[in-house]
Amino acid sequence: MANWCMSVLMFSFVTVYTIVTSLGQGIRRGFRAIVDEVENIYGDMCAGFKVALSKLSVSWIVVVGMIFVLNSLVVGLVPTLTMVAIIAACVGAKYGGRVPRYIRAHVDRIRKSWEKGVDDDDCCAPLPETSLERVPTKLRPRLACKIAVRAIAKVGLLKRSEANSMVYQRVCLDVMESMKMRWHDRLVILPQAVLACLERPEEVEEVMKAIEASCKGRFDVYXGCLLQHRGYNTAIISAIPDGVLLNHEGMVVRKGAPITTERKWYSFAGYASTYEYIVHNSSLVNVCRGLVERVFCVVRDGKLQRPLRPKNNVFERKLGNVGRRISSIVGYCPAMTRSEFCESYSGTRRATYERARLSLDVLPCTRKDAYLKTFVKAEKINITLKPDPAPRVIQPRDPRYNVEVGRYLKPLEPRLMKAIDKLWGEKTAIKGYTVEKVGEILHQKSLRFKNPCFVGLDASRFDQHCSRQALEWEHSVYNAIFRDPYLSELLTWQIDNVGTAYLKDGFVRYRVDGCRMSGDMNTSMGNYLIMSCLVYQFCKDIGIDASLANCGDDCVLYLEKEDLPKLKALPDWFGKMGYSMKVEKPVFTVEEIEFCQQHPVQLSRGYVMVRRPDVCLTKDLCVVRGGMTTERLQRWLYAQHDGGLALTGDCPVLGAFYRRFPSGESHGELSEYSDAHKFKAGKQYGEINSLARYSFWLAFGITPDEQLAIERDLMNWTPNVVPGSCDPRPTLLDYCSDN
């Protein structure tokens, strides 16, 4: 009996205690909710009054005051104040800019997860073999913080902005992919992870605020003075090895008096010193090395060797039908008269061809007119990436020969580009388009594929590997279109090439079989034709559905990711055709495509081709034109300002860079381009938006915060024509250029 009574008493006590405790917790929660609600309503009311006061003018204040007084007299003061409070709360909730409660709840959960710590997260831990199990709802905020730790470790502590949130979203997705997380968990955890990247622990935020305060008011001034440089002679003396030349080939070198004059070129001290450039002299040692390593031989396995040669009759077997299809697509193409050819040019080039035309009226074109007159190209060479490279030589023929062959091939070029497009079934020969149109084409090509993959095809020394077989096949396409024996004879003179180089310190005479000459009228068109048809036939042979963007020897192949292993056969296939081809690392976003040393970036105008910023900020400060005076250099700066902004006015970093060039009423020198007047009005472009900064990061690896930091530094740099000296200094761009 006693035990039974004790049990009843204990049960009653526990029941009463449980009920009282539950009621107490409920009352506390209700009271807390009421207090929170009162705080929210009070905050909304205050925000509403602020909005009303900021919007009301004096006349509106008078009208509202009269309404308030009349309403108080009719219904009373208390109801009127209540109505005003309700209206103010509604206005504040809608337009007061207060963060909604559900957003504050998410932020609070993330902050609590940060407080619990993520010390057990190991960013170097091996990836799981199988997909993770379903993540419980309570653990999602903490897992989001762990993902945020890895994301921050990759791109750093970025400030709160829309562009940076897109960067964090992309990196968090990559982290989730490496963790092999379930698709549904990615959906629900991704926004929490992005929020965790931006809502960092309090101790981190305090240090970031301290850094920001320390940097305020401190900046460096970058002097953009004028620097003068001397031409460069290569330190490597190259000679053709024995057993490399064919029987009728050879190179004769005669030395003269040592050179006493050198090329002179200028640059402006830049904000960045990432790369160093040189310009080769027009000297005997440079011409000899350029001919040996860029015409006769290639460096393979550390030795000078003959370029690859195609197998016998391989071009006719592989590309015979393709060439005939191209010629049939082109159909009839009328040749120009000599006068029409000359009139298609302007400026000094037109005057040169006019003199050649007049001489052709007296003396017909001969074999000697096709001889090459070789010289060293004055171009900016990046010796930071490749110290002391072989100089590039230009090998033009006599203008008389160019007039004769050009009046056939110049009208053919646009027709041939369209024929290549029809062969592929879409725009393939990317020539003659604006940067906006090229960006649009590259983006549209990617939409063809479900899981697109983009692969660059690097043709090593493409001109040098154009063998006799390749040139004869190219010429057969032209001959099938024109069916003119005279053109056929002119084209044969491009196969057995004889050239000379007259220099102040010597003389070179050489003869080479095959090889594309850089000064020929059909150099660009021929490279488009050969490369497009080679890749087309390769895709047919291995059986892949692909799309090609071709700019001569620079190509990007679009294909499905599942077809990527089939490209392993490409180097051997091209090797049999006589070309040394390298398959570059595949990329999977449009911005990562590198085409003609540019990347497509989504700006306010859509996708636009943009050059690498580390190259622009160094190379575009070099002036290699001869006869530059102070006045011409000043006009050159004006032209850089106008031309740079026309292309990249709405582009991060580059727009700020070109705005620092001086602008003036004295425009740059007149162009020989026939429609130069179209550029006087300038390009129309919008503002730099968050999407542009995010796309720029995808293309070049420079985060939005880094972009803004570089732009702030550029505000303290201005190029000018005052001579001076400047020591290189490290900048943020030096650390971003490796991405």
Curated annotation (Swiss-Prot):
InterPro entries cross-referenced by the UniProt entry: DNA/RNA_pol_sf, Rev_trsase/Diguanyl_cyclase, RNA-dir_pol_PSvirus, RNA_pol_HCV, Tombusvirus_p33
Domain RdRp catalytic intervals: 452-567
GO terms for MF: nucleotide binding; RNA binding; RNA-directed RNA polymerase activity
CDD domains (UniProt xref): Aureusvirus_RdRp
Protein origin, superkingdom: Viruses
Entry keyword set: Nucleotide-binding, Nucleotidyltransferase, RNA suppression of termination, RNA-directed RNA polymerase, Transferase, Viral RNA replication
Catalytic activity from the UniProt record: RNA(n) + a ribonucleoside 5'-triphosphate = RNA(n+1) + diphosphate
Pfam families: RdRP_3 (PF00998), Tombus_P33 (PF08500)
GO biological process: viral RNA genome replication
Note: Readthrough of the terminator UAG occurs at position 223.
Protein name as catalogued: RNA-directed RNA polymerase
Naturally occurring in which organism (per UniProt): Pothos latent virus (isolate Pigeonpea/India)
